[in-house]
Amino acid sequence: ETSATSDGIHLLAPENLQLNDKWVLKDGELYPSEKPGGILWSKEKFGDFKISLEYKTSTKANSGLFFRTNPKNPVQEGFEIQIASAGLYSGKHILGSLYDAERAAVEAGKPDGEWNTMTLTCKGPMIKATVNGQTTVDVNIDDWTEGNKNPDGSVNKFKTPLKDLPREGHFGLQYHGQQVWFRDVLVKRL
């Protein structure tokens, strides 16, 4: 399998990832090594795109899909769609949420140990995510006009208004203490 096809770019290929000893890429699956940690970044930046992937979680797992992100400061200079065990969190931190900014409209995750599908489409200010075919987030990032504040008035951790963050950046797959697996990560530029 080549890393680029007419369908897009296969992100889980050594030439497309900044691989390190904290992650294992084997037989098309990516998972944390015995000494796991941190976020694994794409080599390239992406602006407008559609990414699709499959993931599965272990018990009480917390992970995330970072996008349009600066790897040097991912929390403040980028975006994350939350990946987590179903029912583990509440509010704007549940599975499928735009982390700390927009609560997922539906919690669509399968039980730990089962493969889930996720898609994320970004075009200009529009961000749409699905989990297992159900739309979790569909927002216009230009609505986030103040630092540390969501459009609904709730507080977030982002010092910069989300509308002012770059519209291009790296993808990151997060390890946050519990096993998580990824496969079939395909990106198409729009």
Model-derived features with residue positions:
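Carbohydrate-interacting regions of secretory-pathway proteins
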Residues: 1-190
